């Protein structure tokens, strides 16, 4: 203990200030994360700082100073030291870890690879024309292992080819040609290793949420719950109106089919009886014109006229429907816009 205190007393003041600053940032923000910054140029780092300045604080410090700050905080931030490795930056925010992960993923952009670097994945050059006219570039591509030729007055890649496999060292010639072809094998940006929030450490695998699938699952679950509530007659604030409408409809159908003389079904029963009566009368009149009296014959005539008028009006209604179709499309777009608005709630 005395040895540790003696060592601490000989730490330069600027290091002590840096340690205190790290501790203060951890304690004053809801979420604290560690990010990898390997391969990020200074200019890109400055742009990332500007882009994040309204939602997060990005700090680059020595790993030894960060470790000392975490040691001094003790059990306040347990488990985060194991993510402190190589080139590391600290990030502090009051947003959720999920929102932080999404923001950091947006900082990643394709970047050219340098000669001598290790290919992170298979590097493939696709078959097709390039923007280069015939010239020395043809020989340079071929010497880099890219199958090139002249086609229609332009340099073209003759076939799709994997020019460097994952894990292999990228030759300098190939790196130069890839940049000229605007093939950027690297994805460079802040790489979140872990985020700490209220005693829980979140790793990227947990934070990488497919928002569209998650949103669809929520909608499907809500629909299934609604259907279950209606089909099992389980009343809730969301389904009570549907259940009452369903019960009313079923009660009315029962009253009509069982011929129960109640005020709510009398009109339907009378209308049904009238239709049945006119149907029987029509068949009787077809067989014998004298089978129906004048009053009934007049009713049958009115029904026939109404049927003819309805048949004549059908084409006109079809034309009106065609004219209304654009409006329906506009309504569909409005519904889609509404769904897009809901999607915005997920960040």
Swiss-Prot record:
Protein name, UniProt field: Large ribosomal subunit protein uL10
Keyword rRNA-binding among UniProt keywords: yes
Listed CDD domains: Ribosomal_P0_L10e
PANTHER family named among the record's database cross-references: 60S ACIDIC RIBOSOMAL PROTEIN P0, LARGE RIBOSOMAL SUBUNIT PROTEIN UL10
Swiss-Prot/TrEMBL GO biological process terms: cytoplasmic translation
Function: Forms part of the ribosomal stalk, playing a central role in the interaction of the ribosome with GTP-bound translation factors.
Gene: rpl10
Annotated organism of origin: Methanosarcina acetivorans (strain ATCC 35395 / DSM 2834 / JCM 12185 / C2A)
SUPFAM superfamilies named in the record: Ribosomal protein L10-like (SSF160369)
């Amino acid at each position: 203990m005395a040895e540790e205190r003696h060592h601490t007393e000989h730490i330069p003041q600027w290091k002590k200030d840096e340690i205190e600053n790290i501790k203060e940032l951890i304690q004053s923000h809801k979420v604290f994360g560690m990010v990898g910054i390997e391969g990020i140029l200074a200019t890109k780092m400055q742009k990332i700082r500007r882009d994040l300045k309204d939602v997060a604080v990005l700090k680059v410090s020595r790993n030894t100073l960060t470790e000392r700050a975490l040691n001094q905080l003790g059990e306040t931030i347990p488990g985060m030291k194991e993510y402190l490795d190589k080139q590391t930056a600290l990030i502090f925010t009051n947003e959720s870890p999920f929102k932080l992960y999404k923001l950091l993923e947006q900082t990643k952009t394709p970047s050219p690879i340098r000669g001598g670097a290790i290919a992170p994945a298979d590097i493939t050059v696709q078959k097709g024309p390039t923007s280069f006219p015939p010239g020395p570039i043809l020989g340079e591509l071929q010497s880099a292992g890219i199958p090139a030729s002249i086609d229609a007055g332009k340099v073209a890649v003759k076939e799709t080819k994997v020019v460097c496999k994952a894990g292999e060292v990228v030759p300098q010639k190939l790196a130069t040609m890839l940049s000229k072809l605007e093939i950027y094998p690297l994805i460079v940006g802040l790489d979140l290793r872990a985020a700490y929030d209220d005693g829980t450490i979140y790793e990227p695998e947990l934070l990488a949420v497919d928002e569209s699938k998650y949103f669809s699952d929520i909608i499907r679950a809500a629909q299934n719950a609604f259907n279950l509530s209606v089909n099992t007659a389980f009343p809730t604030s969301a389904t009570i109106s549907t259940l009452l409408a369903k019960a009313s409809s079923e009660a009315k159908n029962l009253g009509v089919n069982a011929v129960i003389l109640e005020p709510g079904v009398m009109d339907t029963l009378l209308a049904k009886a009238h239709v049945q009566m006119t149907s029987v009368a029509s068949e009787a009149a077809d067989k014998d014109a004298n089978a129906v009296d004048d009053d009934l014959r007049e009713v049958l005539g009115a029904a026939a006229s109404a049927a003819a008028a309805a048949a004549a009006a059908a084409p006109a209604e079809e034309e009106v429907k065609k004219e209304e179709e654009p409006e329906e499309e506009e309504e569909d777009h409005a519904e889609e816009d509404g769904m897009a608005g809901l999607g915005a709630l997920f960040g």
